[in-house]
From Swiss-Prot:
Pathway: Lipid metabolism; polyunsaturated fatty acid biosynthesis. One of its GO terms (molecular function) is sn-2 acyl-lipid omega-3 desaturase (ferredoxin) activity. This is sn-2 acyl-lipid omega-3 desaturase (ferredoxin), chloroplastic. Most abundant in leaves and seedlings. Belongs to the fatty acid desaturase type 1 family. It is a multi-pass membrane protein. Its EC number is 1.14.19.35. A motif (Histidine box-3) lies at residues 366-370.
Length: 446
């Protein structure tokens, strides 16, 4: 009887030049050699084979011989090779330019709607007055702490809207921006034009060690000139979160001038009138607060305005600090030829503030805001999503927040303890820690 094998069409004879399988169908042996010699046929002793004596006297084995297919060896990369491939240098020049990011952002994200912007002002101002009226009416010590937190957060929201006026993202009308900006910022004791101009300097020089204006690093030389009380204030929580009013008066260590004085080196001669106007508005607001102290009493003013004002200051310092510090990876600061507007802007960070995102007008979408401050706040989330594919690893996805951004407190504390100064030399530098500031602190590896 001829050996039979299955074909696509049915059963066909197995050619005599091939030996029949010598193992059962559970075998993984595929040493299957052609032979022309009848001596290659041997009787199978497999219990699963079906032997029949052929006319030649040889036993045919019809066992199913299944073997694994031939596989190509897989060469795994060593952990070191994989690490080199995955390693990302945030200080390296990006493979894209500002125009690439701009092109990825939908055109409607650049459109400013003054009526929509004004609607946010009306909403926030109405909430501020409603909170004050409710707290004054209820006037008990269960309500007051809740009021302070809520009202301080709303003062901070007013600051963000005034901040949009300063950038021109509120509307295309400079006069409208100026009027609304003065009303909002003066109400929380911020000199609108003085701050607007210094904040413009911050955006134009973001990420530059010497030329940046807000929360920029101190060089080691300047750090070593600070007296102990200044160091303690600057690197101790919560004191550092109360820094903003002092910054307005005297700027940061290593810089001179004031946001209130028209002759400060912050300003150009042509900006003198603007600075005087804002300082006059600030003075008028301060005078109004003094009058209210005599009208309703200093204790009531402290409860209604004073404590919420300082909560607002803490929000401002908390948010602005974390937009430039505290990432788990060390981020570079630049000098000289290594600095560019794009590279400096890419060192900023987005943050998620949970329920507060909507209240403070999505200020946490900070990367795109820093690169393109003309985009209105109500388009920043969409613009950020559109830009992510271009930014790639240069965009650092923020940690998701719960209802309140409590996760950021640990990040803030860690950064305050570790980010003290940068080297006096070098065009790409990173923060270092002073091991003697608090005694023993863990210093980041360079």
């Amino acid at each position: 009887m001829a050996n039979l094998v299955l074909s696509e069409c049915g059963i066909r004879p197995l050619p005599r030049i091939y030996t029949t399988p010598r193992s059962n169908f559970l075998s993984n042996n595929n040493k299957f050699r052609p032979s022309l010699s009848s001596s290659s046929y041997k009787t199978s002793s497999s219990p699963l084979s079906f032997g029949l004596n052929s006319r030649d006297g040889f036993t045919r084995n019809w066992a199913l011989n299944v073997s694994t297919p031939l596989t190509t060896p897989i060469f795994e990369e060593s952990p070191l090779e994989e690490d080199n491939k995955q390693r990302f240098d945030p200080g390296a020049p990006p493979p894209f330019n500002l125009a690439d990011i701009r092109a990825a952002i939908p055109k409607h994200c650049w459109v400013k709607n003054p009526w929509k912007s004004l609607s946010y002002v009306v909403r926030d101002v109405a909430i501020v007055f409603a909170l004050a009226a409710g707290a004054a009416y209820l006037n008990n010590w269960i309500v007051w702490p809740l009021y302070w937190l809520a009202q301080g957060t709303m003062f901070w929201a007013l600051f963000v809207l005034g901040h949009d006026c300063g950038h021109g993202s509120f509307s295309n009308d400079p006069k409208l921006n100026s009027v609304v900006g003065h009303l909002l910022h003066s109400s929380i004791l911020v000199p609108y034009h003085g701050w607007r101009i210094s904040h413009r300097t911050h955006h134009q020089n973001h990420g530059h060690v010497e030329n940046d204006e807000s929360w920029h690093p101190m060089s080691e030389k300047i750090y070593n000139t600070l007296d102990k009380p200044t160091r303690f204030f600057r690197f101790t929580l919560p004191l550092v979160m109360l820094a903003y009013p002092f910054y307005l008066w005297a700027r940061s260590p290593g810089k001179k001038g004031s946001h209130y004085h028209p002759d400060s080196d912050l300003f150009l001669p042509k900006e003198r009138k603007d600075v005087l106007t804002s300082t006059a508005c600030w003075t008028a607001m301060a005078a109004l607060l003094v009058c209210l102290n005599f009208t309703i009493g200093p204790i009531q003013m402290l409860k209604l305005y004073g404590i919420p004002y300082w909560i607002n200051v803490m929000w401002l310092d908390f948010v602005t600090y974390l937009h430039h510090h505290g990432h788990e990876d060390k981020l570079p600061w630049y000098r000289g030829k290594e600095w560019s507007y794009l590279r400096g802007g890419l060192t900023t960070l987005d943050r998620d503030y949970g329920l507060i995102n909507n209240i403070h007008h999505d200020i946490g979408t900070h990367v795109i805001h820093h690169l393109f401050p003309q985009i209105p706040h109500y388009h920043l989330v969409e613009a950020t999503e559109a830009a992510k594919p271009v930014l790639g690893k240069y965009y650092r996805e923020p940690d998701k927040s719960g209802p309140l951004p409590l996760h950021l407190l640990e990040i803030l504390a860690k950064s305050i303890k570790e980010d003290h100064y940068v080297s006096d030399e070098g065009e790409v530098v990173y923060y270092k820690a002073d091991p003697n500031l608090y005694g023993e602190v863990k210093v980041r590896a360079d």
